[in-house]
């Protein structure tokens, strides 16, 4: 995205837009410096029926005094059940000839190519992704977060985590987000 903006190209990104808040800030700063460049962040949930149904219920006053939201995903993907016996970074492998590894890495700390960092698996590693929550949180939390105008949480507490270590995120977790009282 940064390279495209610097070269006066319009940018459309899907989640994950960035891996860290700092990376997202840098992207927003770059977009502000190029006001004639169109930038957009997509979330396919904004095109699905549940998004419009929730909005209709909000507009009709059916949803109003919300004090708690429970959101979950119980449909694991192939990359959400990684090998929890990994206790070191994987060794380098032969780089596929059609992959520009340096471009793929972007601003991520350098790692030698390994298939376990690529093709979906990148989601689990701290240096590449954001785990199952980062992968699916945008889908399962976004609609309620937007229409209830929740803003940023003032407290986030990990209540349960399974399948993580010093190298990758949990593949299962229960996290409590506390938000300021709504207006």
Name what the model sees in each region:
Residues 1-46, 61:
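Beta-strand-loop-alpha-helix segment that lines the small-molecule cofactor/substrate pocket
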Residues 33-40, 45-156, 164-166, 175, ...:
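Predominantly a Rossmann-like dinucleotide-binding segment in NAD(P)-dependent oxidoreductases
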Residues 168-170:
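Short coil/turn motifs at beta-sheet boundaries
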Residues 178:
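Short hydrophobic/aromatic beta-strand micro-patches
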């Amino acid at each position: 995205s940064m390279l495209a903006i610097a070269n006066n190209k319009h940018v459309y990104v899907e989640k994950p837009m960035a891996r860290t808040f700092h990376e997202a800030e840098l992207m927003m700063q770059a977009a502000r410096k190029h006001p004639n460049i169109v930038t957009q962040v997509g979330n396919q949930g904004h095109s699905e029926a549940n998004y419009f149904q929730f909005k209709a219920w909000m507009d009709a006053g059916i949803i109003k005094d919300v004090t708690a939201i429970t959101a979950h995903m119980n449909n694991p993907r192939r990359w959400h059940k990684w090998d929890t016996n990994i206790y070191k970074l994987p060794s380098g492998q032969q780089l596929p000839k059609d992959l520009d590894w340096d471009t793929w890495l972007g601003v991520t700390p350098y790692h030698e190519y390994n298939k376990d960092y690529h093709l979906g698996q990148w989601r689990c590693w701290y240096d590449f992704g954001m785990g199952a929550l980062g992968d699916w949180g945008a889908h399962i939390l976004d609609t309620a977060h937007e229409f209830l105008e929740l803003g940023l949480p003032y407290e986030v507490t990990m209540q349960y985590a399974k399948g993580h270590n010093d190298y990758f995120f949990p593949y299962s977790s229960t996290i409590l987000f506390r938000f300021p009282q709504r207006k």
